[in-house]
């Protein structure tokens, strides 16, 4: 299905769809990958394309149901995902198995949103509320020209970065800290203390000019990964010092840390759940 065809059926009424209804709903968990370049983030917004809205309308097309798809968290416009989770409840009788949901959704979704796996989960499972951690990857392009193949998939810095200096700075950020200085001015989170479990920085196995920063934490503030990335880049450029980062963690001063890196370099890499709650086959998890 082309994007034009998808937009056409999105605007149609689905009130005439006839379906059988089960007495109780089944909770389904989706593992998704998507290119966020043409979407305004996850959450439904009036009259603009979002990932959540596209999924909900796809399910409505298949079953006639109006459902809410719960995502593992909000994403900004342009953010991508290699592994993102979302769940929804369905009472439709015409799609009863995970295999059928997998085939049906991939048949109607636009080609920049793909369902990688589907599994049934307990009725009280929620993709965001049950998560105990998340892992993100940020991609930086250091080559001196902006390649058309990485233009909307990475941040083009256009200069060589000192990865050793960046790794030393990352050590300061690891552990439990108040990350007030590393969040958007619009962030409304009441809990600004987060626990960064791991930060790794290295070059891509596929392209030497691509630098990958991976960050795992119990949860994140709005723009936190992007501001950490901007800070690590500016430390490599000698625009920010280690002392500035330490001060920012102590006093929450946003002016002491780096810029907010562009959204299009950010990828949702993994949503972490308690052992045994979600079991994805290893072959479907991208690294």
Predicted regions and their residues:
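Structured-RNA-binding interfaces characteristic of tRNA pseudouridine synthases
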Residues: 1-287
């Amino acid at each position: 299905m082309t994007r034009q065809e998808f937009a056409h059926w999105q605007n149609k009424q689905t009130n005439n769809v006839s379906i059988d209804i089960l007495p109780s709903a089944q909770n389904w968990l989706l593992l998704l990958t998507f290119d966020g370049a043409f979407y305004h983030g996850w959450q439904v917004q009036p009259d603009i394309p979002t990932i959540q809205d596209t999924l909900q309308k796809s399910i409505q097309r298949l079953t006639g149901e109006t459902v809410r798809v719960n995502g593992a968290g909000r994403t900004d416009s342009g953010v991508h995902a290699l592994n993102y989770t979302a769940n929804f409840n369905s009472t439709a009788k015409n799609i009863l198995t995970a295999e059928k949901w997998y085939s049906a959704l991939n048949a109607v979704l636009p080609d920049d949103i793909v369902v990688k796996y589907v599994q049934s989960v307990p009725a009280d499972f929620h993709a965001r509320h049950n998560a105990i951690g998340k892992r993100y990857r940020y991609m930086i392009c250091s080559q001196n020209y902006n390649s058309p193949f990485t233009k909307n998939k990475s941040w083009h810095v256009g200069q060589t970065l000192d990865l050793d200096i960046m790794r030393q700075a990352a050590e300061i950020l690891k552990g439990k800290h108040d990350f007030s200085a590393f969040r958007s001015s619009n962030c409304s989170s009441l809990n600004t203390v987060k626990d960064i479990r791991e930060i790794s920085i290295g070059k891509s196995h596929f392209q030497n000019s691509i630098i990958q920063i991976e960050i795992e934490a119990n949860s994140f503030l709005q723009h936190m990964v992007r501001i950490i990335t901007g800070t690590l880049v500016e430390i490599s450029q000698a625009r920010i010092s280690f002392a500035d980062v330490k001060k920012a963690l102590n006093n929450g001063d946003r002016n002491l840390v780096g810029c907010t890196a562009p959204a299009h370099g950010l990828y949702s890499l993994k949503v972490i759940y308690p052992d045994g709650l979600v079991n994805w086959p290893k072959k479907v998890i991208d690294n």
